[in-house]
Amino acid sequence: MYVELVDETGQVPSEIIEQTKEVLAFAAKKLNLKESTEMSVTFVDNARSHELNLQYRETDRPTDVISLEYKPDESEFFFDEDMELPEELLEEMDPFIGELFISIDKAAEQAADYGHSIEREYGWLAVHGFLHINGYDHYTPEEESEMFGLQEEILTAYGLTR
């Protein structure tokens, strides 16, 4: 999987950037996504997280991770519903699945609050957001159990334990 990473803060260590790419590629394999799958991750501060949270969720506070799922039917591209694309073309298309915005301030706060490493927290936030982009949620106890169980399974298998 290709992950475009942007550090708007200029403060994220290169090891965290590489780990984020690796853990997301690992999670993509776990979900059997195509190797050509693409997404982006932007590291932001709390002020930018607050702006984005207000813009996309109408919530007036910063948050740890914002997940924006790409929905082809809401894109600028137009495909006629009756149009059939050749199978070869469909296989070649690189599916962009969405973007994450991770607050570095919240990551540091939460790592301290939960008593685990900053590496674990960045991994947790990346995988959590990734699962949201791929249709997982935690509105009900059943959904929460499924999503958090899969999230923990991915992080543990990758090596980011508590």
From Swiss-Prot:
Zn(2+) binds at H128, H132, H138. It is found in: Cytoplasm. The keyword Transcription does not apply. Gene3D superfamilies: Metalloproteases ('zincins'), catalytic domain. Its main location: cytoplasm. Its cofactor is Zn(2+). The keyword Translocase does not apply. GO terms for cellular component: cytoplasm. GO terms for molecular function: metalloendopeptidase activity; RNA endonuclease activity; zinc ion binding. Its EC number is 3.1.-.-. GO terms for biological process: rRNA processing. InterPro entries: MetalPrtase_cat_dom_sf_prd, YbeY, YbeY_CS. Signal peptide: none annotated. Binds 1 zinc ion. Keywords: Cytoplasm, Endonuclease, Hydrolase, Metal-binding, Nuclease, Ribosome biogenesis, rRNA processing, Zinc. PANTHER family: ENDORIBONUCLEASE YBEY, CHLOROPLASTIC. Belongs to the endoribonuclease YbeY family. Single strand-specific metallo-endoribonuclease involved in late-stage 70S ribosome quality control and in maturation of the 3' terminus of the 16S rRNA. This is Endoribonuclease YbeY. It comes from Lactococcus lactis subsp. lactis (strain IL1403). The gene is ybeY.
